[in-house]
């Protein structure tokens, strides 16, 4: 007699969650690899670097396009097909690579690599915490979101003020915020994954990519904040 009967209603949601989270991290990794490749390739292209550094309209257009893609993916996910969702995420990752290519001009390759490793370690630890903790992190959501808005506004103000003190304050606060968001977003995605029907492969793909985009943004922003702190300028 089986003393510990296994109920399908228990086993299937757990298996579905694991499938969903595996795809989230998988697509996030694909996005990061594409971003890294495009950034490296663009940094080694004199034509692309000249375009980025001399054509302000192109750079502003690039940033607007990135914001538009995030809004479309977040707001219209239910209306998009799995194929279009995948294409838009890949496009966003590539455009981010173009935007970030300048870091190879500003910082040494060794410091970029070491900062990436540090970021991966911090991200992994906090994502693991968010996934495994029994503590409900939803209460931190509003606080982290308000802090994020504060960081964005302070960064915009400092674009004109050029205050080094404000820049460092934003940087260190930003590290704390994105570390917290990593744990918060991971738990939120875990809760979402428990509700997803993995038999609907199209829906699974779309929401896996949406989750990947969320964690991708946390990782990229944490990396940029840490690079300001640990990066060695050329």
Curated annotation (Swiss-Prot):
GO cellular component: plasma membrane
Transmembrane segments: 24-44, 57-77, 80-100, 103-123, 137-157, 164-184, 207-227
One Gene Ontology biological process: regulation of proteolysis
Residues on Periplasmic side: 1-23, 78-79, 124-136, 185-206
Record GO terms (molecular function): calcium channel activity
Membrane disposition: Multi-pass membrane protein
Keyword Cell inner membrane on entry: yes
Keyword terms: Cell inner membrane, Cell membrane, Membrane, Transmembrane, Transmembrane helix
Any one Pfam family match given in the protein's UniProt record, by short name: Bax1-I
Keyword Transmembrane helix: yes
Cytoplasmic membrane side: 45-56, 101-102, 158-163, 228-234
Places the protein is found: Cell inner membrane
Similarity comment: family membership: Belongs to the BI1 family.
PANTHER family the UniProt entry points to: BAX INHIBITOR-RELATED, PROTEIN LIFEGUARD 4
Name of protein: Inner membrane protein YbhL
Organism: Escherichia coli (strain K12)
């Amino acid at each position: 007699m089986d003393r510990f009967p296994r109920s399908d209603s228990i086993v299937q949601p757990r298996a579905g969650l694991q499938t969903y989270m595996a795809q989230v991290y998988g697509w996030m990794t694909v996005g990061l690899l594409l971003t890294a490749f495009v950034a490296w390739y663009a940094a080694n292209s004199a034509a692309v670097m000249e375009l980025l550094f001399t054509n302000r309209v192109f750079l502003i257009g690039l940033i607007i396009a990135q914001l538009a893609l995030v809004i479309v993916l977040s707001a219209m996910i239910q209306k998009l097909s799995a194929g279009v969702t995948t294409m838009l995420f890949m496009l966003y990752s590539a455009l981010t690579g173009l935007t970030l290519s300048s870091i190879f001009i500003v910082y040494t390759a060794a410091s970029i690599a070491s900062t990436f490793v540090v970021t991966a370690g911090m991200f992994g630890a906090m994502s693991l915490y968010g996934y495994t903790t029994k503590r409900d992190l939803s209460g931190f959501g509003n606080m982290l979101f308000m802090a994020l808005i504060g960081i964005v506004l302070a960064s915009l103000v400092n674009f004109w003020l050029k205050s080094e003190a404000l820049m460092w304050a934003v940087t260190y606060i930003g590290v704390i915020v994105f570390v917290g968001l990593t744990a918060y977003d991971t738990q939120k995605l875990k809760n979402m994954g428990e509700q997803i029907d993995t038999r609907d492969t199209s829906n699974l793909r779309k929401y896996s990519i949406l989750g990947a985009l969320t964690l991708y943004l946390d990782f990229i922003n944490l990396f940029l904040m840490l690079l300001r702190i640990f990066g060695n300028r050329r």
